[in-house]
Amino acid sequence: MSRTFFVGGNFKMNGSLESIKAIVERLNASELDPKTEVVISPPFPYLLLAKESLKKPTVSVAGQNSFDKGDGAFTGEVSVAQLKDVGAKWVILGHSERRTINKESSEWIADKTKYALDNGLDVILCIGETIDEKKAGKTLDVVRSQLDPVIAKIKDWSNVVIAYEPVWAIGTGLAATAEDAQQIHHEIRAYLKDKIGAQADKVRIIYGGSVNGKNSGTFKDKSDVDGFLVGGASLKPEFVDIINSRL
C-alpha cells in the first residue's frame, strides 16, 4: 500500500513573529520533496502569518489543539471554526503534553477528534507510552487503550494521521530505533485492521520523538513508518533535511 509521506512540525510554545517568518521563508526557499506532505503547527497567534506567508503547495498549517464544541463561553480554548477561518487544514490532538499537563483523557481526545473531523479539520492523533510503561512491557496495551475511544467514535479514518510518540523520547534525545518504531507501527496497524478493517492499510502512522536531520534517514526503508512529527528540530534548518529524508 502506497501512502503519502507526511512530515509535521510541532513548534509547541516556541517562536516569535521574527522566527516564524524566518522558518517559513526557509521552507519557501528550499527544494522540498514534492512527494512529501508537510504540515507546520506554530502557536495560535502566528497561524495566520504562517498560512499567508507560505508559498509551497505541499505545505499547510495546523492548530496545536481544538475544542470539542463550537464558539462560546470557553475562555482560553480555540474552536475548529476559528482554525479553519485562518486557513488551518489540520489540528494536533492527544499530544502527551496535553494528556499530562492539561489532564486530557483519551475519551475527551476522542470527542475532540470526532468534532474536528465532523467539522472539516483533518487530525494528527498522538499516542504513546511513558518510560515506566515501556519498562513494564505495556507499550501496546497503552497505545491500544488510547486508540479505543477514538475507534468507538470514528468510522472514516481517511483524514486521520496517527502519530506514535513515545513520551520517553520527546525532547530527550532518546529516539526509538527505526527497527523498534517499525515493529510498534506494524502492531498498531494490525490492531487497527482488526478494529476498522481494510481502511487501516491507508492510515498513515508517523513517528515522533527526538527526530532530527541525522537519524531521520534511518527510517527510510521501514514500510509502516509513514513520516514524522517533529518537535525541536522543526524550528531549525535541519527540518528541511527531515522533509527530504526519503530522497
Swiss-Prot record:
GO molecular function: triose-phosphate isomerase activity
Gene Ontology cellular component list: cytosol
SUPFAM superfamilies with a match to the protein in the record: Triosephosphate isomerase (TIM)
Catalytic activity entry: D-glyceraldehyde 3-phosphate = dihydroxyacetone phosphate
Any one GO BP annotation for this protein: glycerol catabolic process
Pathway: Carbohydrate biosynthesis; gluconeogenesis; Carbohydrate degradation; glycolysis; D-glyceraldehyde 3-phosphate from glycerone phosphate: step 1/1
Record: residues binding substrate: 10, 12
A Pfam family per the record: TIM
EC number(s) on file: 5.3.1.1
InterPro entries per UniProt: Aldolase_TIM, TIM_sf, TrioseP_Isoase_bac/euk, Triosephosphate_isomerase, Triosephosphate_isomerase_AS
Record keywords, A-Z: Gluconeogenesis, Glycolysis, Isomerase
Domain of life from the UniProt record: Eukaryota
Top EC class of this enzyme: isomerase
Assembly behavior: Homodimer.
HAMAP family for the chain: TIM_B
NCBIfam families recorded: tim
Protein name as annotated: Triosephosphate isomerase
Organism: Yarrowia lipolytica (strain CLIB 122 / E 150) (Yeast)
Organism placement in taxonomy: Eukaryota, Fungi, Dikarya, Ascomycota, Saccharomycotina
